[in-house]
């Protein structure tokens, strides 16, 4: 791709059209005035056009009004007030039902809208009530647009008192989503504007902000615990006077996105959970205008109300232009039987069309130029007429200056009523080889354009002359359609369109082009056509041109593959009245257009896919394995009586959704692998289920084998462009690089794996530009790659893939995106393609506009297999029949007529606007059956506005809330036989309805069935009377009507799953052999309507047994069943292979299920009973023998009153060896290396750290070097050993359980002791802890730490180790039998070492990895306890930040423990350890520096949340920073101490990144206790993040300190002051090294002794001395004791006398009893009451944190224990 295309500046602009504030602009400048960013589309430049067109484009005024016959927003805001923000759909429906019933109009025609009374124009934006935050608001009009001008004033600032403005109704919605769309102009003086939007605003210290200052756009969030802002490269701030279209979305899950003029302002930001939780109840959305000194912000925001604004761009006088001069033109004609075209022999130009005596112009003025690579060329043309219908033009294209040397053949051909314009051959005489490097990209024919050569036109001289065109709009308030009368005079027109039509009162014409052009993003994408007004003589002509085509393109010199090229083609179709309504308009052209348009691959299936949904797998949990999804297909087939289905498999690959992206052929093994997936594909066909998969072509994760440095996208500053961060931190890719380097091969690999049968590929994310060019051309190439494999193309966004896609998720999932980002809002587009796509605005009333009851419906997508936590089966079915059946019914027809009503005023989402509703739509099918859909009222305030009547061939099939609609197609769209034809009945309200049946149904009897998950039930024979039937049935319950009696198809449940009916969907237990009281075993439904087996109230054991089929001999298997046991009675799963029996059981379930995509999670809508779910899988691992004919599985429950629930049985091959190195469930040492995990994170289950969520813990796969330490600054290994480890991403500071074992996975038996060891990686100290608990976990309340746990915090593993560390703990099973172990997220914050954003996420500071878990039963001894304790305590005694007195006591006690006898009892060991724990808790830290608590006051100018105390918190990532508004250099920071304290100097620690506020010159004044001032200065400190020191050269007993930065670094210099830390050092008395001279002398003397016993004693003392020295245990008293002891050794038979010195409690080999006591230091040392979490260097107490950090780290160190010999 030519590099110049990336950097090209706009050379022209065109008029823009939009409707209302927050609009998706319906047309815009083709390119902006700035260089095209990498995010921008890279096609569509039309520099160097013919002079008149270029001039028009260059001089067309920017006008944000949708001027051409678009209704203006009325001043009457007659809709109900919106005060609390948009309501949920459920609330709106409830309100609607509460309204009194309105009497239906007696006339057949719809009720008219009520007339509106104009009102005075008032400001739509108001300043806030708080006086200090008030600005000014004025109304102004400019160039035909009304604005509210918002200004800050002198009383405002840019921190706590900015000018704030609010708009009635603009709030965060009921679901927690915020959407803001503004069109504004910055009227401030250049570089002085500080404007933006506050979201979820509580006050200026608690909010989310998106805005700009002179340095550009940025985001920021603030909360009491976490505040930060964007520090990356910024998008430039708007130019003064420029028009800006700002779009911001903040989703409830914390994802923040923003764009201005369709340019992304930053990559997706995900708010920290703490911030999101803190602000979740805040609803305010405000605009901010800041002031600083004399700089004011002035911004004009376009208003909704544009009524009465005068436009100034329509010429007052008739226009004239050059006359046509054909004196040198030679014309010819080509014609079919119906259409004649007059063509120019010198150039492929059509002068005029004739059809049945009526004419339409083409390009009336002579034109003879082609634009190659945006260079104007006049070709040498050879004309050849092939036959009556066809002519050819051979063009020689030469431009030596631009290396263009090519030939091109263009063919004009008339076919029936069509004109085809085709480039049939292109020869580039430069050497170009697809896939190879080219030396100069100018040699490519990158783009080809015939702009200026209108394919068809209409003249103002013709009666009824009009142009009608469609652009992309996804804003429900704003139609993308333009309807323009072609008159003289008229406004200029030069604009891109997706669809375009010209018409007179006689003829209409439409144009299709395969141009994949983008004139920009938003409404300017997919602009395949260009409409242009040209004045010729005394007439105005509006012509439709094909936009530019793309041909040969490259990426950094690598030519794109051959398949990316597509020969340019365009077609014109001309028609008379096509819909027999006795008039000609665009609708006739649109009907004819279907005969020339492209048809997206797979479009014929769309109408029959009625039951779309997502089956979700995530985070290694395999919630919906492939073959279980097959059972879901069968269940829906029964419940819908055979409607077609579409199942999108999110998480088909790797470890589930958003794992392993780009490796498309990596089929998820834990959900069944390739074999099960192929089985699903094959078996689903029978039920008309179309399967698709979710992929990502925009970002990748380190685990993927396609993750490599070359494909990754970088920001301008060289940093990586980060994407989604959930299981792993993703990085965006460069899509152009990917295309040039073999992306196609990945699709081909997938096809090879799966073969045929997969229906569609859903491309996630693509379209938001995060991988670069995602515009029309790039998207079409991607779709071609997918189509080439035989797959249908689907996409995420409503605007994405308009040319090729048949399914758009954000259009279909109505809760997504907000009102500005929904389906396509264009009546023209929907008219043309309603039957081909699920891309439309659906019925979601709170969005308003087109979403308030569209007549043709629109897909409404729900789910019951885990996506978004949706597992409400009944809700899914109800929604399907309430919304989707009729939507799909209409798609079996094509639209033939569309009638709009009178504009109505709507108010929602903070906007008041006009909307023109469609009132009547006609549709026909191939058999000429006619459907008419009519809205009952044009009055938006009437309930009948939201009701329709539908007739089929004049017979009513829907009336308001009820329909009885014929359905004559099977699940695959084939016509049903007459006896199988049916009608679906559904009514959202109860009550009787009467229906006229078609004549061929009007027999005496018909048969009605209630539809349930068991199929057709409760048969009713109904009598037909006078051709009518009356139905009085349940509300929201589907029924089906047949002519004759019907039966249900036989279902073979759970094919390939080795058991019949794994999910109890059959409704019967007859396939089980039941022992015990069978009546106590029954199938019941959960709160989410999920079928379960329940055993309850049994007086004896109840067992259900079934054979496992299809097993392989001598093969290892795993089987699990979900179980929720509310009883203390044992519930078991047992497998008997005929040779061996394995059993696993659980007593009362103790762990709630927090797995969001699991149908049995503990959300109320999915709960088992009582609004909770304790469902967890219970496993049995077994190995088959040689005979597999009689392998049985048994589910059983012992006697008990309470209930036990079972569901989802799954059996599959598994090669784990966890039990004593054997596979089968059994005794022995348990080992889990995570290399062969069956499913989930066995033996752990997910804890409540995130609530019910898509868990951020998963099995991480190794991809060296990218998942390992070192790459991109990564601090820890994601995979510790082998290919897999268990990874938790980013769950720090949660004070909750990450994961835990449960007894059914590993049982810590009562009274038995186990050694638990594992290797781990942790990115920060003490953020995660190993915990031991029993019973149900009880989390701490209100953010406090859980109290019922034995907790061992774990230190980081990378600052002092080159590999993972090992932890060892002893666990004794409680008598209750419900002990468990797990990993806990503490309340401690991570330390990101100055990194932030994606870097902090990627590098692992917030992560925890586990591997090589081992649980070994041991016979507990005192020695084990002492050895384990020593591992925990030795790191603590090595620390140097505690006082000598407190540490010596601990050292001596630890040494005593190290010398304990091997046979020390358990009780004695525990007693000794308790003493040590008390001494450890009593440690006192040294005071090395002043801390915040030492000061009586800290006073300094500061930005909110960035006060001076931050410089004393020990956290390098928090800052003291003066006001961001600047101006605080030279202002003092004053620190007053509580009492005079000795200090010796200052260490200034600058911020870790950036320069703003870094001190350059400083003045430091220290006032001592006598009042004397000591002044120090420093100058020219360098601008870096290294510490800077001022050494006082003396000790000062300070009472007050004043620090002033007189010169600083940063933006502009001398604006701010900042510091990460201010460390005022305290004098330290150096600890005197231990005096060993006495010991050495005694040792020298003792070494001369000759008695063997003495020699052994000396050796023992030496060993003990070495052990104490090596392990930092030596104290003065110990040295003194050792010396005294040695001095008393003599060569004699007598024992030495007792030493004269009082000694600690040592146990040396020659000492049999205690001869001294360890002093009770705990009585002497008072522990501070509040152990703050502060850096040790500051001297602040932090006992638990620091000591656990040290003690646990020893578990990863080698221990050298001296074994002393007894006397």
Swiss-Prot record:
GO terms for cellular component: extracellular region. The keyword Calcium applies. Pfam families: F5_F8_type_C, Gal_mutarotas_3, GalBD_like, GH101_dom-5, GH101_N, Glyco_hyd_101C, Glyco_hydro_101, YSIRK_signal. Residues 1-39 form the signal peptide. GO terms for molecular function: carbohydrate binding; endo-alpha-N-acetylgalactosaminidase activity; metal ion binding. Its main location: secreted. The active site is at 764 (nucleophile), 796 (proton donor/acceptor). Residues 112-124 have a biased composition (Low complexity). It is found in: Secreted, Cell wall. Ca(2+) 2 binds at residues 1233, 1235, 1281, 1284, 1411. It is a peptidoglycan-anchor. The hydrolysis reaction catalyzed by SpGH101 proceeds with retention of the anomeric configuration. Involved in the breakdown of mucin-type O-linked glycans. Specifically removes the T-antigen disaccharide (Gal-beta-1,3-GalNAc-alpha) from extracellular host glycoproteins. Representative of a broadly important class of virulence factors. Belongs to the glycosyl hydrolase 101 family. A subfamily. This is Endo-alpha-N-acetylgalactosaminidase.
